[in-house]
Design a protein with these regions (language model features):
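Short C-terminal tail/terminal secondary-structure segment
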Residues: 2-3, 147, 235-251
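Short, small/polar-rich loop/turn modules that mediate ligand/substrate recognition or access, typified
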Residues: 88, 174, 178, 234-236
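Substrate-binding pocket helix/loop in short-chain dehydrogenase/reductase
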Residues: 98-99, 103-108, 204
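Active-site helix of classical SDR
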Residues: 122, 158, 166
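Alpha-helical segment proximal to the catalytic Tyr-Lys
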Residues: 127, 170-175, 232
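Residue(s) in the substrate-gating loop at a strand-loop-helix junction
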Residues: 142
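C-terminal helical subdomain
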Residues: 181, 202-230, 234, 241-243
């Protein structure tokens, strides 16, 4: 599976790594020979993931919306690996609700994790990368951040914020640090499975030109490319990987 020789030995932090896109991405970078440090709020799931994948270099249980938790996770990575070369900020949540019935506490929680967590992790990584003279910051946004989707007003707004955060950081940290975000469409993750019945999934697939959900491994492959030297001139980009879902009207 390994394709990018330059990723061998790179110190990579991946948040939201106990399942879904984060876990698939961690596996991909480990296959590339990177030193993978995984982060997730679910300590039990994180420990099970680390046990299943002894090739991962280490882990830290952290709530990315808590600044002290984030600082502690980076400190642990510093202790184990001596720094960071690549951040893949992927932790996030979504809760299906119509906009007029979203409790404000839920709105704040989604924003704090999906956008606040991206900011806190990027700040810690960016400071380290700028000091050492290089690095790559990658964030998971969403096609929901590029256009309106019903029932996810808080999630959509948070992911739109991630896209603009990406562009701002890319401008501020260039040319030393590259910053990009990935905008997946529908991905068949445990989170998606929990929210959609089989009938709902089939209906969604009918509206996607490629007629299927993405596999988490396909998102991980894009992250590997964006961290590689082949992407060395790409920064400030929001890259869609959605099977053509947002290309235009499809029927």
């Amino acid at each position: 599976m390994a394709r990018y020789e330059e990723l061998k030995g790179k110190r990579v932090m991946i948040t939201g790594a106990a399942s879904g896109i984060g876990l698939a991405t961690a596996r991909r970078f480990a296959a590339e020979g990177a030193k993978v440090f995984i982060v997730d709020y679910n300590k039990k799931a994180l420990e099970a993931t680390q046990k299943e994948h002894p090739e991962f270099a280490g882990f830290s249980a952290a709530d990315v919306s808590d600044e002290e938790n984030v600082k502690a996770a980076f400190a642990e990575m510093d202790r184990l690996l001596g720094g960071i070369d690549v951040l893949i900020s992927n932790a996030g949540i979504s809760i299906r609700s119509d906009a007029l019935n979203i409790p404000y506490a839920q709105w704040k929680k989604v924003m704090d994790i999906n956008l606040g967590g991206m900011f806190l992790c990027a700040k810690e990584a960016g400071r380290r990368m700028k000091a050492r003279g290089g690095g790559v910051i990658l964030m998971t946004a969403s096609s929901n951040g590029t256009e309106g989707h019903r029932w996810y007003a808080d999630y959509n707004a948070s992911k739109a914020g991630v896209i603009l955060l990406t562009k701002t950081l890319a401008l501020e940290l260039a040319p030393v640090v590259r910053v990009n975000c990935v905008c997946p469409g529908y991905v068949l993750t445990p989170m998606q499975r929990a929210e959609y019945t089989d009938e709902m999934l089939a209906k969604v697939n009918e509206g996607i030109p490629m007629k299927r959900h993405a596999a988490p491994e396909e998102i991980g492959a894009l992250y590997a490319f964006l961290a590689s030297n082949d992407a060395r001139y790409i920064t400030g980009a929001d890259i869609r990987i959605d099977g053509g879902e947002t290309a235009g009207l499809y029927s």
